[in-house]
A protein has these predicted regions:
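Gly/Pro/Ser/Thr-rich low-complexity, intrinsically disordered segments predominantly at protein N-termini
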Residues: 1-180
Length: 180
């Protein structure tokens, strides 16, 4: 069954607080994220996706040396209407009792994409840019490349050989080895 705009004129948008309350009451039975007030079901993680995430997590954790912390597939808060769950986040060290890191705390967001490339390069890119994320990577598993976007202009750069976070250039990731 499909709906036309006349039959289904608008969506109900949830605030971050309402979304968190739904989770606390056990009403979200799947992996979800909140994007601009809309609850999105997250895709299952493929073995290749998980492996790439594990490798990147190890590389970033080895390079951290107390400069940042690595968050893997956990929420971040962006304003009052969004709580995405990127694959990896590099954020400043510190304690967040009762809250997730926000844009001011984050130096890099990484999304690994095997089935959601257009969404990650469209809606998610716009969300991260609008909310002040400083650097965003989309790891394109099918094309074995990484798309990098850096504030303030967020112009697309594509990397196939190696890449480093702009604020941590000493951490070099060999993409040929990563995708091998």
């Amino acid at each position: 069954m499909s709906f036309t705009k006349e039959q289904f004129p608008s969506l109900h948008r949830f605030s971050l607080q309402q979304y968190c309350e739904l989770g606390e009451f056990g009403l979200l039975d799947r992996r979800t994220e909140l994007l601009d007030g809309v609850i999105i079901d997250m895709e299952p993680v493929s073995p290749w996706h998980a492996n790439i995430g594990d490798i990147l997590s190890r590389i970033f954790n080895e390079g951290a040396r107390g400069r940042f912390r690595v968050r893997v597939q956990y929420p971040i808060n962006l304003g009052q209407m969004s709580q995405p769950q990127p694959d990896l986040v590099l954020y400043r060290p510190g304690m967040w009792r009762g809250q997730h890191p926000g844009a001011a705390d984050i130096s890099l967001v990484v999304q690994i994409s095997d089935s959601s490339l257009s969404f990650d390069l469209g809606e998610k890119l716009a969300l991260y840019r609008a909310n002040g994320i400083q650097e965003y990577w989309v790891v394109d598993l099918k094309a074995t490349q990484v798309h990098r976007f850096v504030a303030p202009h967020f112009k697309s750069q594509t990397f196939r050989d190696s890449i480093s976070p702009s604020v941590w250039p000493d951490i070099r990731i060999d993409l040929r080895e990563l995708f091998a």
